[in-house]
C-alpha cells in the first residue's frame, strides 16, 4: 500500500519535530514493513499567480500572452495552452524555478519577453496516465489561491511516498485513517479525525436482498456532492490510482482512506430492487471488456448484473460526468467468492485485492461515514449498521506467563496502555473490549502481540534460562540423525566364534565366554563389531547392492554399547566428516593412531581425557576381503559438551593464514588440538600442504573476529 507521509503526518497530528525517518521507523516497529521510500517533489520555487490579462502574441497565433500578478511583482508569461482565462489563478515556474534538472529562465519568444512557464499537473511530477482527462495537456486553473502561499506546501508536493507491506490479517491498515491511528498511538497524539457512529434515514423504496453477503448497504445522497478538490485528486494520484470525475474519485478516496471498495451507479439506469446472486452469463465490464461469468457473485438490478461484487462495475450502469442521480454501494462478501471473480475477470486492482481480504464491521462503518460526509450526511440508506464492540475475558496477569514477569511492573506499561486506548482497546471488568475495525483479535496471545508492538521488542530484557547439563543414555538421537547422513540401520549377532573374535581395539582385559552355547559360531561376545559389519557388506555385495552405507548400535564385550558405521562408497575424509557430525555435541579429540588391522595412512583414534573411546579406519587389505572405511565408538563413554549462552556477535569474521612446520603427520593433530582449545578462534581449515626435506609444512586458515586477530598474531609469533 502506498502512503503519503504528509497525509499520515496531518491525520496523526504529528509535530514537525518528528522527522519523516522517525515516522518510517515507527511504521516498521509497530509490525508493518516499509518496502521503499520515494521522494515525490520534482520542482522548486514555483508560485501562485492571478491572470490579469490574456491576449494573442501578434507574431504567433498559437501563443497566448498572460499578464500575471504574483506576490512579488507582475510578470508576462507566454503559453500554448488555450484554456487560460482572465481572473483565474495558476501555478507557474518563474525565473530560477526548476523542473527536474531544468532551470527556468526569462527569454524572448516571438518578439515578446516571457518570464517563466505555466504549470500543468504533468509538469508538477504526476504520471500523465493518472491525470483527469480535463487536465490532459492543459494548464490547471484555480478559482482562488493565496498568492503568498507556496504551492509546494499547498499541494503537498514536498512529500515522500512509502510503500508499506501490510499483513494479510490487517486489511484495515491498508487505509490512511487506521495507519494514521497506529502512528498516533505510537507517538501518543490526538488524531485530526474522529471515528463517528452516525445513524441515517432509511430509504423508503429500496428493496435489497442481502443473500450471499456479509454486509451490504446502498446510499442515495439527498444533497449535491461536495467537489473533490485538486488536493484530494493529488492524494489519489499519489496512490497510483487514476482520477476520472468527482463520483469515481470519491469511491477511490474511500478506498485509500478506509481500505473499503466502493461502487457508484447511475441511479436512472437501475431499479429499486437490488439483489446479490450468482450468475453465469457474458457481461461487459468497465472499460468495455467482455468476460464470461461462471456462477460468479454479482450485484443485480432485478435480473440485470450491475457489478461483479467487490471487483468491478458493469459498463452500462457506471457513472460519468453527465450522471445527475447516483447511488453508492459498499459491501462485504465471502473471500472465496471474490477470489473466484478475480480469476474470471483477470483484473488485479486495488479494489479487488482489498475485497478478497476479510473486512471488519468497523471498517465498513467508517467507510459509510466518510462517504456520507461529502453530502453533509444528508443521505438515505438501505439499512443502518450495528457497531458493537466484541470482547473476551482478560486480565493483565494473563500475560505474565508469556513474559515471565509481572506485566504491570514493566517500565513502559502505562505508556503502552495509553497507546492501546488510543487504538480503541478498553480494559475493564476483567474483559478486553476490541476496536470494531479489528477482526484479527481473538485470543490472549493476540493482546500480547498488541502489547509488544508498542512496548518495543528491543525494550524487553531477556534472562538466560538456568540450563542444567545432564548425560543421557537415550540412543534415539543417533537412530534419528544418522539415517539423514545416508546410512541404513542393520542388526547383527553379538555372539561370534572364538576364532573370529580376534580384533580387540579397545584393549578389553578378558573375553566374555558363554558357559552354554548352541554352536561354536556363537560362543563369545565380540570385542568389536567390525567383522559383523563386514559380513553385512558381503551379504549385500553378493546381491548386487554395490553402494553400502550401514550403521548399528550393538553390544561388545561386557555389555559395552558400541556405535559402528561402515561405508564402501565414501572417502576416508568424507566418512570422517560424518563422524564429526554425529559427535558435534560431544567432548572428544582426534589423534593420529591405528591398529594392525587398519590402513597405515588412513587411521585416526578418538579420545576423551586421554581415554580411547573410538576410532576411524580404512580396513587393511591383509585382514579383510573387502575395501571399506569403518568407525566404532563407545557411546556410553561419550560426554556432552557444556552448553554456554553467549551474545551473538554481528561483526564480520576476518581470516588469518598461518604456516605450521611439523616433523610428522602426527604433529598436525597436535596443532589441531592447540587450535581447538583456543576460544579466540571461530573456526579453521587446512588449505595447503607441501613437503620441505623431512619437514611437513601445513597452511591453515583461521577465522576469528577482528578484535581477536591481533592476539592470535602475538600467540603464533607473527
Curated annotation (Swiss-Prot):
<keyword id="KW-0067">ATP-binding</keyword>
<dbReference type="Pfam" id="PF17759">
    <property type="entry name" value="tRNA_synthFbeta"/>
</dbReference>
<feature type="binding site">
    <location>
        <position position="440"/>
    </location>
    <ligand>
        <name>Mg(2+)</name>
    </ligand>
</feature>
<feature type="domain" description="tRNA-binding">
    <location>
        <begin position="40"/>
        <end position="153"/>
    </location>
</feature>
<keyword id="KW-0479">Metal-binding</keyword>
<dbReference type="GO" id="GO:0005524">
    <property type="term" value="F:ATP binding"/>
</dbReference>
<dbReference type="InterPro" id="IPR041616">
    <property type="entry name" value="PheRS_beta_core"/>
</dbReference>
<keyword id="KW-0694">RNA-binding</keyword>
<comment type="similarity">
    <text>Belongs to the phenylalanyl-tRNA synthetase beta subunit family. Type 1 subfamily.</text>
</comment>
<dbReference type="InterPro" id="IPR004532">
    <property type="entry name" value="Phe-tRNA-ligase_IIc_bsu_bact"/>
</dbReference>
<dbReference type="Pfam" id="PF03483">
    <property type="entry name" value="B3_4"/>
</dbReference>
<dbReference type="InterPro" id="IPR005146">
    <property type="entry name" value="B3/B4_tRNA-bd"/>
</dbReference>
<dbReference type="GO" id="GO:0000287">
    <property type="term" value="F:magnesium ion binding"/>
</dbReference>
<dbReference type="InterPro" id="IPR045864">
    <property type="entry name" value="aa-tRNA-synth_II/BPL/LPL"/>
</dbReference>
<keyword id="KW-0436">Ligase</keyword>
<keyword id="KW-0547">Nucleotide-binding</keyword>
<feature type="domain" description="B5">
    <location>
        <begin position="387"/>
        <end position="462"/>
    </location>
</feature>
<dbReference type="Pfam" id="PF01588">
    <property type="entry name" value="tRNA_bind"/>
</dbReference>
<dbReference type="GO" id="GO:0006432">
    <property type="term" value="P:phenylalanyl-tRNA aminoacylation"/>
</dbReference>
<feature type="binding site">
    <location>
        <position position="446"/>
    </location>
    <ligand>
        <name>Mg(2+)</name>
    </ligand>
</feature>
<dbReference type="InterPro" id="IPR045060">
    <property type="entry name" value="Phe-tRNA-ligase_IIc_bsu"/>
</dbReference>
<keyword id="KW-0820">tRNA-binding</keyword>
<protein>
    <recommendedName>
        <fullName>Phenylalanine--tRNA ligase beta subunit</fullName>
        <ecNumber>6.1.1.20</ecNumber>
    </recommendedName>
</protein>
<dbReference type="GO" id="GO:0000049">
    <property type="term" value="F:tRNA binding"/>
</dbReference>
<feature type="binding site">
    <location>
        <position position="450"/>
    </location>
    <ligand>
        <name>Mg(2+)</name>
    </ligand>
</feature>
<keyword id="KW-0648">Protein biosynthesis</keyword>
<keyword id="KW-0030">Aminoacyl-tRNA synthetase</keyword>
<dbReference type="Pfam" id="PF03484">
    <property type="entry name" value="B5"/>
</dbReference>
<feature type="binding site">
    <location>
        <position position="449"/>
    </location>
    <ligand>
        <name>Mg(2+)</name>
    </ligand>
</feature>
<dbReference type="InterPro" id="IPR012340">
    <property type="entry name" value="NA-bd_OB-fold"/>
</dbReference>
<comment type="subunit">
    <text>Tetramer of two alpha and two beta subunits.</text>
</comment>
<dbReference type="InterPro" id="IPR020825">
    <property type="entry name" value="Phe-tRNA_synthase-like_B3/B4"/>
</dbReference>
<dbReference type="GO" id="GO:0004826">
    <property type="term" value="F:phenylalanine-tRNA ligase activity"/>
</dbReference>
<dbReference type="InterPro" id="IPR033714">
    <property type="entry name" value="tRNA_bind_bactPheRS"/>
</dbReference>
<dbReference type="GO" id="GO:0009328">
    <property type="term" value="C:phenylalanine-tRNA ligase complex"/>
</dbReference>
<keyword id="KW-0963">Cytoplasm</keyword>
<dbReference type="InterPro" id="IPR002547">
    <property type="entry name" value="tRNA-bd_dom"/>
</dbReference>
<dbReference type="InterPro" id="IPR009061">
    <property type="entry name" value="DNA-bd_dom_put_sf"/>
</dbReference>
<dbReference type="InterPro" id="IPR005147">
    <property type="entry name" value="tRNA_synthase_B5-dom"/>
</dbReference>
<keyword id="KW-0460">Magnesium</keyword>
Amino acid at each position: 500500500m502506498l502512503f503519503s507521509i504528509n497525509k499520515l503526518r496531518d491525520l496523526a497530528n504529528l509535530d514537525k519535530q518528528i522527522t519523516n525517518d522517525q515516522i518510517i521507523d515507527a511504521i516498521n516497529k509497530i509490525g508493518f514493513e516499509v518496502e521503499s521510500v520515494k521522494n515525490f517533489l520534482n520542482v522548486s520555487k514555483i508560485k501562485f499567480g492571478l491572470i490579469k490579462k490574456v491576449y494573442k502574441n501578434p507574431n504567433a497565433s498559437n501563443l497566448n500572452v498572460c499578464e500575471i500578478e504574483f506576490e512579488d511583482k507582475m510578470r508576462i508569461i507566454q503559453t500554448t495552452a488555450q484554456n487560460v482565462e482572465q481572473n483565474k489563478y495558476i501555478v507557474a515556474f518563474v525565473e530560477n524555478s526548476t523542473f527536474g534538472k531544468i532551470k527556468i529562465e526569462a527569454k524572448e519568444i516571438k518578439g515578446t519577453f516571457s518570464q517563466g512557464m505555466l504549470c500543468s499537473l504533468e509538469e508538477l511530477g504526476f504520471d500523465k496516465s493518472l491525470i483527469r482527462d480535463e487536465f490532459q495537456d492543459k494548464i490547471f486553473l484555480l478559482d482562488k489561491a493565496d498568492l503568498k502561499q507556496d504551492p509546494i506546501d499547498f499541494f503537498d508536493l514536498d512529500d515522500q511516498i512509502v510503500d508499506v507491506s501490510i499483513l494479510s490479517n490487517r486489511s484495515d491498515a491498508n487505509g490512511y485513517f487506521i495507519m494514521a491511528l497506529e502512528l498516533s498511538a505510537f507517538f501518543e497524539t490526538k488524531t485530526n479525525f474522529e471515528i463517528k457512529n452516525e445513524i441515517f434515514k432509511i430509504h423508503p423504496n429500496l428493496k435489497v436482498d442481502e443473500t450471499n453477503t456479509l454486509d451490504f448497504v446502498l446510499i442515495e445522497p439527498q444533497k449535491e456532492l461536495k467537489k473533490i478538490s485538486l488536493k484530494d485528486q493529488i492524494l489519489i494520484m499519489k496512490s497510483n490510482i487514476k482520477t476520472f470525475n468527482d463520483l469515481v474519485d470519491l469511491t477511490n478516496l474511500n478506498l485509500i482512506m478506509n481500505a473499503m471498495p466502493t461502487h457508484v451507479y447511475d441511479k436512472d439506469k437501475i431499479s429499486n430492487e437490488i439483489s446479490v446472486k450468482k450468475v453465469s452469463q457474458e457481461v461487459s465490464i468497465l472499460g468495455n471488456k467482455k468476460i464470461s461469468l461462471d456462477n460468479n457473485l454479482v450485484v443485480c438490478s432485478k435480473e440485470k448484473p450491475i457489478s461483479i461484487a467487490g471487483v468491478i462495475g458493469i459498463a452500462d450502469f457506471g457513472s460519468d460526468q453527465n450522471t445527475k442521480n447516483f447511488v453508492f454501494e459498499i459491501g462485504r462478501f465471502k473471500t472465496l467468492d471474490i477470489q473466484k471473480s478475480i480469476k474470471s475477470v483477470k483484473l488485479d486492482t486495488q479494489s479487488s485485492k482489498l475485497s478478497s481480504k476479510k473486512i471488519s464491521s468497523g471498517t465498513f462503518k467508517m467507510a459509510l461515514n466518510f462517504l456520507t460526509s461529502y453530502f453533509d450526511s444528508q443521505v438515505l440508506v438501505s439499512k443502518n449498521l450495528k457497531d458493537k464492540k466484541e470482547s473476551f475475558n482478560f486480565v493483565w496477569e494473563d500475560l505474565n506467563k508469556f513474559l515471565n514477569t509481572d506485566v504491570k511492573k514493566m517500565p513502559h506499561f502505562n505508556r503502552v496502555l495509553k497507546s492501546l486506548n488510543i487504538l480503541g482497546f478498553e480494559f475493564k471488568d476483567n474483559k478486553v473490549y476490541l476496536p470494531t475495525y479489528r477482526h484479527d483479535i481473538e485470543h490472549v496471545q493476540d493482546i500480547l502481540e498488541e502489547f509488544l508492538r508498542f512496548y518495543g521488542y528491543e525494550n524487553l530484557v531477556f534472562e538466560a534460562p538456568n540450563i542444567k547439563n545432564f548425560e543421557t543414555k537415550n540412543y534415539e538421537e543417533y537412530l534419528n540423525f544418522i539415517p539423514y547422513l545416508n546410512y541404513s540401520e542393520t542388526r547383527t549377532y553379538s555372539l561370534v566364534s572364538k576364532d573370529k573374535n580376534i580384533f580387540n581395539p579397545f584393549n578389553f582385559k578378558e573375553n566374555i565366554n558363554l558357559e552354554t552355547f548352541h554352536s561354536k559360531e556363537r560362543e563369545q561376545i565380540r570385542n568389536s563389531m567390525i567383522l559383523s559389519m563386514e559380513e553385512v557388506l558381503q551379504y549385500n555385495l553378493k546381491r548386487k547392492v554395490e553402494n553400502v552405507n550401514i550403521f548399528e548400535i550393538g553390544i561388545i564385550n561386557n555389555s559395552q554399547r558400541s556405535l559402528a558405521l561402515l561405508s564402501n562408497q565414501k572417502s576416508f575424509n568424507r566418512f570422517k566428516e560424518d563422524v564429526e557430525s554425529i559427535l558435534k555435541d560431544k567432548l572428544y579429540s582426534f589423534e593420529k593412531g591405528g591398529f594392525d588391522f587398519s590402513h597405515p595412512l588412513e587411521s585416526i583414534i578418538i579420545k576423551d581425557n586421554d581415554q580411547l573411546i573410538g576410532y576411524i579406519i580404512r580396513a587393511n587389505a591383509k585382514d579383510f576381503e573387502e575395501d571399506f572405511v569403518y568407525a566404532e565408538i563407545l557411546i556410553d563413554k561419550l560426554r556432552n559438551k557444556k552448553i554456554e549462552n553467549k551474545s551473538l556477535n554481528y561483526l564480520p569474521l576476518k581470516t588469518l593464514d598461518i604456516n605450521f612446520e611439523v616433523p610428522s603427520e602426527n604433529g598436525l593433530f597436535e596443532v589441531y588440538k592447540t587450535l581447538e582449545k583456543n576460544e579466540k578462534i571461530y573456526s579453521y581449515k587446512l588449505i595447503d600442504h607441501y613437503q620441505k626435506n623431512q619437514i611437513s609444512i601445513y597452511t591453515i586458515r583461521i577465522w576469528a573476529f577482528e578484535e581477536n586477530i591481533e592476539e592470535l598474531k602475538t600467540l603464533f609469533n607473527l
